[in-house]
Amino acid sequence: MAVFARMVKGQVRHYSAPVDMAIPASKRKFIPSSGSYPKGFLVSGTHVGVKASNTKFPDLALISSETPCSAAAVFTTNKFQAAPVQVSRDILKTRQGHGIRSVVINSGCANAVTGKGGLEDAVAMGKKVDECNGLNEPSTLVMSTGVIGQRLPISKILNNIPAAHTNLSSTHDAWLSTARAICTTDTFPKLLSRTFTLPSSPERTYRLAGMTKGAGMIHPNMATLLGVLCTDAPVEPSALQSLLKYAVARSFNSISIDGDTSTNDTVAILANGAAGGAPVTSSAASPDYTALQDILTSFTQSLSQLVVRDGEGATKFVTVRVQNSPHYESARLIASTIARSPLVKTALYGRDANWGRILCAIGYTQGVAPGTVVPERTSVSFKPVDGSPILKLLVNGEPEQVDEERASVILQEEDLEIVVDLGGGEKGEQGLGGEEAVYWFCDFSHEYVTINGDYRT
């Protein structure tokens, strides 16, 4: 406990750190140079040597709270759930979301499909952190990411956890190093933080920080990757779980890079209440709950979009907006299908305004409610990010005379929005329903094949 007491002093400050020059110049703009982090949380990123390469980058992340936290998480739906997923799920169930103190994460080895030994390794990681915290019962969530089917170098990890604990810090450098420690094929660490207030105590400032990793094997079905969120707001566990589930459905579950859902996907949130105030409950009538729902959703959307911007070999960040649908779920399914279509993704990489591929994806989407997609009412457009007029490709089922030169200019940009209107284009026939779903995805390039062809070499 003494180490927490020493390090937490002066925590409510803004910090700055130099940019890692190994990060591609085009990605440095996404890395924060400072941050405002939640009270009572300490973090560290440590080089252990889990990864096969000889890099000296950190590959063991530790996030700890000075006091017990409410905790919640969402996990992968992949049938081959990794050992840390099983262990963390069991801990949260046993503790009912109460009394969680830490999260420990290794990168470089997924500890998935590793049998009884893999489960024992995951338990040992959490137990070692608990020992460092002076605790006798399981209070640490465990995550792993990397190559599937290989055992962890568990001795290396266990031998270095005490050092990782000793190095816990509240500085921006520490948060950035911790975000870097969970990376695999990522080209930059993904870290965000913000402050917020709640209606019940507008004079009180709360803080929210989050880190995530992912660049490939990304497609939601709960989850999509690894992510850890921390806040010093007081939130009851049941409220935290419902808040996270809502936010993830509209953020981490609304991105796609390659259509693959990992065995290890986990997004967790810890709330230690260190900033004080009345606990947020899951009451639908609670203004604090509603406000925090909007705050958390917006925050996780920004965080998850960083994953898309770091998609393996990606050159474009694409928003697909499906609007004027009778049902939200149908709109979501259509957006998801477009986002994972290899033909759509390669056309965008080639700067080809081939709207037929988009239309094809709309047409073969499975599970859409009858009457949702009516060809005579379907429109497709490109929306430039510079605010200039949309480029209509298809209006009410009829193809437009496309200005190929303007289309090429739009597709040269890094950001692009595809708008699919199921209610009659500009008319916006609200009688059909005004439901809208949004997905974020990237294109497919030659480099994606190279990266994944060489993944284990």
Curated annotation (Swiss-Prot):
The alpha and beta chains are autoproteolytically processed from a single precursor protein within the mitochondrion. It is found in: Mitochondrion matrix. The record marks 223-224 as: Cleavage. Its EC number is 2.3.1.35, 2.3.1.1. The record marks 145-146 as: Involved in the stabilization of negative charge on the oxyanion by the formation of the oxyanion hole. Signal peptide: none annotated. GO terms for biological process: L-arginine biosynthetic process; ornithine biosynthetic process. Pathway: Amino-acid biosynthesis; L-arginine biosynthesis; L-ornithine and N-acetyl-L-glutamate from L-glutamate and N(2)-acetyl-L-ornithine (cyclic): step 1/1; Amino-acid biosynthesis; L-arginine biosynthesis; N(2)-acetyl-L-ornithine from L-glutamate: step 1/4. It comes from the Eukaryota. The active site is at residue 224. It is an enzyme of class 2 (transferase). Heterodimer of an alpha and a beta chain. Belongs to the ArgJ family. This is Arginine biosynthesis bifunctional protein ArgJ, mitochondrial.
